UniProtKB/Swiss-Prot annotation:
Organism of derivation: Bacillus subtilis (strain 168)
Pfam families: SpoVAC_SpoVAEB (PF03862)
Keywords: Sporulation
Domain of life of the source: Bacteria
Gene this protein is translated from: spoVAEB
PANTHER family xref list: STAGE V SPORULATION PROTEIN AC-RELATED (PTHR38450), STAGE V SPORULATION PROTEIN AEB (PTHR38450:SF2)
An individual GO BP term: sporulation resulting in formation of a cellular spore
Protein name (Swiss-Prot/TrEMBL): Stage V sporulation protein AEB
InterPro entries linked: Spore_V_AE (IPR014204), SpoVA (IPR005562)
Length: 116
């Protein structure tokens, strides 16, 4: 049942993104940025943690979770170190994902030739 719930919740997030692309003709960059900001806003109000408890992996895999992780780390470090902790905490939870994205993008760029 957990897998089904994660699939449905993650799929619902993807459906919203696809509708934004198709109906409102937003660019993928606008949709991605909007989802990151929405994730940060929901985390700021404490809603996204409850959604993660409900949806499991369906809430942690999409890009919305990236905004949640950015703000969650910043708020945690701000409580510990004050204002300077905001800058430290932003990348605390997301540094592994950012590093992996850079590494895999580099590997793909080395292996394949660009078109054009």
């Amino acid at each position: 049942m957990d897998y089904l719930l994660a699939f449905v919740c993650g799929g619902a997030i993807c459906i919203v993104g696809q509708l934004l692309l198709d109906i409102f003709k937003l660019t993928p960059a606008h949709v991605m940025t909007s989802f990151v900001v929405i994730g940060a806003i929901l985390d700021g109000f404490g809603i996204y943690d409850k959604f993660i408890e409900f949806a499991g992996g369906g809430a942690t895999v999409p890009i919305v979770s990236f905004g949640h992780s950015l703000l969650h780390g910043a708020m945690h470090q701000a409580h510990i170190h004050g204002f300077i902790g905001i800058g430290m905490g932003i990348f605390e939870l997301t540094s592994a994902g950012i590093s992996a994205a850079i590494l895999f993008a580099f590997i793909v760029a080395v292996i394949f030739k660009p078109k054009g």
